């Protein structure tokens, strides 16, 4: 048995999702009495200049670089086994070796497709368990390596995709994607309506605009939706201060129809009272929506994992996918007027959601390494037994 194991969680700042999952896992380990947990942006620390450039290109994929990103995502998938793997496997290796030598972790977890650790295992024979926590409702080959001990995935659909490309089924566990604990709490909605000055007798449309211009024509959309009777529009601008200031002028014209916010710390509160939400199809956002059964309208998915996520939720009946700006208003208004469809989408979200994903992942990892949590017993004996 490993007493007080040290856990190293590797992540990357491409969007907020991977880091958020890493932090959620870190908090869950600490809640279970495992205090020695390190979160590291391996690529950012190893090659900050290259990382800044690639992050910039990633953000540009939302606006001017969609075709470029399509070629990258699907092109890498095709040639990955031949050329990319060797280069990518060694990216961040120097920093990684220093981390392993100095910190001496007992467990390594990846919330971003970093294969430097399993590749190092393969080349040097070091013995350290490696776990990959996939953060989308699809899989890219870049996540896969023979030296990864276990994969934690969102759904049985992802598991099937992985089995199809040769990953042994016993190495894959369906747990859901880790989300912030606030999304799994019981909250009195009356408190939320009062806090945000929302009306219980009206439908609420939540628009998550984001900080990087990923949702276009927000002001025009708000103007259109403000004319819809018995509807309140709530816009979360994130850290996009320019957008917030632009929309506040609209809010001043009709503060009952439009509510504008910047960064919202407890955004789960708005999820709980919204009738439906317009957003981008990131894996973490969709997992949070599933946890609270929020019907989603997915705005112009970027080719790659966003598009794969969107297609999955659309096929399950949990989402409406918008691929052209001209469709947003008409399709959203139609959905808001269709209570039967909204209820069906909520039920579809409920069928996708797996409760307490972070807890199940942490319990399973600790059980497999014979490092049971201090103070708190394992929540899922059945899951833990599958690792022994």
Swiss-Prot record:
InterPro entries reported in the protein's UniProt record: Diacylglyc_glucosyltr_N (IPR009695), Glyco_trans_28_C (IPR007235), Glycosyltransf_28_UgtP (IPR050519), Pro_diacylglycrl_glcsylTrfase (IPR023589)
Q: Does the keyword Lipid metabolism apply?
A: yes
- Keywords on this record? Carbohydrate metabolism, Cell membrane, Glycosyltransferase, Lipid biosynthesis, Lipid metabolism, Membrane, Transferase
Q: Care to name a GO molecular-function term for this sequence?
A: 1,2-diacylglycerol 3-glucosyltransferase activity
Q: Which reaction does it catalyse?
A: a 1,2-diacyl-3-O-(beta-D-glucopyranosyl)-sn-glycerol + UDP-alpha-D-glucose = a 1,2-diacyl-3-O-(beta-D-Glc-(1->6)-beta-D-Glc)-sn-glycerol + UDP + H(+); a 1,2-diacyl-3-O-(beta-D-Glc-(1->6)-beta-D-Glc)-sn-glycerol + UDP-alpha-D-glucose = a 1,2-diacyl-3-O-(beta-D-Glc-(1->6)-beta-D-Glc-(1->6)-beta-D-Glc)-sn-glycerol + UDP + H(+); a 1,2-diacyl-sn-glycerol + UDP-alpha-D-glucose = a 1,2-diacyl-3-O-(beta-D-glucopyranosyl)-sn-glycerol + UDP + H(+)
Any keyword ATP-binding?
A: no
One matching Pfam family? MGDG_synth
Q: Which SUPFAM superfamilies match?
A: UDP-Glycosyltransferase/glycogen phosphorylase
Q: Where in the cell is it found?
A: Cell membrane
Q: Which GO terms describe its cellular component?
A: plasma membrane
Which NCBIfam families does this chain map to? PRK13609.1
Q: Which family does it belong to?
A: Belongs to the glycosyltransferase 28 family. UgtP subfamily.
Q: What does this protein do?
A: Processive glucosyltransferase involved in the biosynthesis of both the bilayer- and non-bilayer-forming membrane glucolipids. Is able to successively transfer up to three glucosyl residues to diacylglycerol (DAG), thereby catalyzing the formation of beta-monoglucosyl-DAG (3-O-(beta-D-glucopyranosyl)-1,2-diacyl-sn-glycerol), beta-diglucosyl-DAG (3-O-(beta-D-glucopyranosyl-beta-(1->6)-D-glucopyranosyl)-1,2-diacyl-sn-glycerol) and beta-triglucosyl-DAG (3-O-(beta-D-glucopyranosyl-beta-(1->6)-D-glucopyranosyl-beta-(1->6)-D-glucopyranosyl)-1,2-diacyl-sn-glycerol).
What protein name applies here? Answer: Processive diacylglycerol beta-glucosyltransferase
């Amino acid at each position: 048995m490993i007493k007080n194991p040290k856990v190293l969680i590797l992540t990357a700042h491409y969007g907020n999702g991977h880091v958020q999952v890493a932090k959620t896992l870190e908090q869950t380990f600490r809640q279970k009495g495992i205090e020695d947990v390190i979160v590291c942006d391996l690529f950012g620390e190893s090659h900050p200049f290259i990382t800044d450039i690639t992050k910039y290109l990633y953000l540009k994929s939302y606006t001017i670089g969609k075709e470029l990103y399509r070629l990258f995502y699907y092109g890498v998938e095709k040639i990955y086994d031949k050329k990319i793997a060797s280069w990518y496997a060694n990216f961040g290796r120097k920093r990684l070796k220093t981390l392993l030598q100095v910190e001496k972790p007992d467990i390594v977890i990846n919330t971003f497709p970093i294969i430097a650790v399993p590749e190092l295992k393969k080349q040097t024979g070091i013995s350290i368990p490696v776990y990959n926590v996939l953060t989308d409702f699809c899989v890219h080959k870049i996540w896969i390596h023979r030296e990864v001990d276990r994969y934690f995935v969102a759904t049985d659909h992802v598991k099937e995709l992985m089995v199809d490309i040769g990953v042994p089924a016993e190495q894959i566990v369906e747990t859901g994607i880790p989300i912030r604990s606030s999304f799994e709490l019981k909250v009195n909605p009356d408190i939320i309506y009062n806090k945000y000055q929302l009306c219980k007798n009206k439908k609420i449309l939540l628009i998550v605009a984001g900080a990087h211009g990923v949702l276009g024509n927000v002001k025009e959309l708000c103007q259109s939706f403000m004319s819809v009777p018995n509807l309140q529009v709530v816009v979360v601008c994130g850290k996009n201060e320019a957008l917030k200031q632009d929309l506040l002028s609209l809010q001043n014209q009709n503060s009952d129809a439009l509510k504008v916010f910047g960064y919202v710390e407890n955004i789960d509160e708005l999820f709980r009272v919204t009738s439906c939400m317009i957003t981008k199809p990131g894996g973490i956002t969709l997992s949070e929506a599933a946890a609270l059964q929020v019907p989603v309208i997915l705005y112009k998915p970027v080719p790659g994992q966003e598009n794969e996520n969107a297609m999955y939720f659309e096929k399950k009946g949990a989402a409406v996918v918008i691929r052209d700006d001209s469709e947003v208003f008409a399709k959203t208004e139609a959905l808001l007027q269709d209570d039967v469809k909204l209820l069906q989408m909520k039920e579809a979200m409920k069928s996708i959601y797996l409760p307490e994903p972070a807890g199940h992942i942490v319990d399973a990892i600790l059980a497999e390494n014979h490092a049971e949590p201090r103070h708190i017993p394992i929540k899922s004996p059945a899951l833990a037994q599958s690792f022994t």
